Amino acid sequence: MTDPESPPPAPVQRPSRAASIGALVLIVEALGIAVLALWQVLAIFRGDTVSLASALALIVLTFLFAVAVASFAVATMRSRSWGRSGGVVTQVLVLAIALGALTGQYAHPFLALVLAVPAVIGIWALWAAARAAGRNAPR
C-alpha cells in the first residue's frame, strides 16, 4: 500500500538514442569479454597454461570485467552518470589495446581496426549521451 504523503514516482524517461547506442556497444563488448573468459577456461582443459593458479585468477578477473562492462551498459540505459563514465574508461582501454595490436613485432592492423571502430563509436555515443543528460537535467 502506498503512503499518501509520499511524492509520486518520477516519470520514466526513455534513454536517448546516443545512450542506446553506447549501451549496445558496451553489451557487445561485455559479451566479447565473457567469450574471452570461456576461451581461457578451455585453454586450461587443453593444457595450454603454465600456471593453473594464474590462469584461474585471470579467468575470475576477466569474468568480473565482463560483469562490470555489462553493468555500465545497464546504468547507461538508466541514465546513470557512473555508467557513462565507466563506459568511457572502458573505451579508452580498448583503444589502448587496439594501439598495441597496430604496433609492435606482431602487429595485426585488421584486429586493431576491429577493436578501434566500436571503441570510437562508443566514446562518441557515451559523450553524446552525457550531453543529452545534461540538457535534460532539472535546473
PLM segments and residue spans:
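Topology signature of small-to-medium multi-pass alpha-helical membrane proteins
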Residues: M1-R139
